[in-house]
């Protein structure tokens, strides 16, 4: 868990609940396995506290209604600097993004005298200039994935666009073991607008979840 302050109860929690309102399971902070087989019982470990919990539950937290935050902006700039689209330090933008991601939820962080570089180093997710571009992209997009907490559609978009971060693929994934690339057209679109539907399918490819959109990373 990288000693993440957002799930730190002792220093940043309230009423025995951490800022993200996540309960620790017997194996630590771990959710349901991704892509488990249909019909199998879900192996739930960590879970969100319910809205009956008086402190730090996300069901009634206005922070879950984010559209775009400062952390996401900095990770966009980090990627742009990394691939040479803009000037500036990709490392600096990465650090600023990670810091903004924490401070979004905990404006008073840090309380313990550490800074973002120290925290990233202690968590073993610090920036190394010696890393290959793909390794740096993984660093950026793993932290961006967490910064997009509660914005799951954007997380899905970023994964399809870049292939990062590396996500687990369980046996229940189906679709040939490939992450879904798109949604299919609803039946009502096919039935009420058949001409344009057929034209769209002809231009875009088969109307199945494995057909990649035009901007997607192969």
Residue map of PLM features:
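Hydrophobic-face positions in mid-chain alpha helices that act as interaction patches
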Residues: 1-77, 82-83, 90-130, 135-143, ...
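Residue-level recognition of short, well-ordered coil/turn positions
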Residues: 85-86, 164
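C-terminal functional modules
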Residues: 102-106, 110-218
């Amino acid at each position: 868990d990288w000693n993440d302050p957002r799930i730190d109860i002792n220093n940043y929690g309230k009423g025995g609940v951490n800022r993200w309102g996540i309960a620790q399971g017997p194996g630590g902070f771990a959710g349901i396995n991704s892509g488990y087989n249909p019909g199998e019982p879900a192996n739930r470990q960590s879970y969100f506290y319910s809205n009956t919990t008086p402190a730090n539950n996300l069901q009634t937290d206005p922070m879950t209604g984010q559209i775009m935050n400062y952390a996401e902006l900095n990770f966009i700039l980090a990627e742009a600097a990394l691939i040479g689209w803009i000037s500036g330090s990709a490392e600096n933008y990465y650090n600023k993004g990670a810091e903004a991601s924490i401070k979004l939820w905990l404006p008073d962080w840090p309380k313990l005298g550490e800074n973002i570089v120290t925290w990233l180093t202690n968590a073993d997710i610090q920036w190394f200039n010696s890393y290959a571009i793909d390794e740096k992209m993984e660093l950026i997009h793993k932290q961006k994935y967490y910064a997009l907490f509660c914005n799951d559609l954007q997380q899905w978009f970023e994964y399809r666009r870049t292939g990062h971060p590396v996500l687990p693929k369980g046996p229940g994934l189906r679709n040939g073991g490939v992450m879904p690339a798109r949604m299919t057209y609803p039946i009502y679109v096919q039935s009420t607008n058949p001409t344009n539907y057929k034209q769209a399918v002809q231009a875009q490819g088969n109307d199945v979840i494995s057909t990649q959109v035009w901007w997607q990373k192969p």
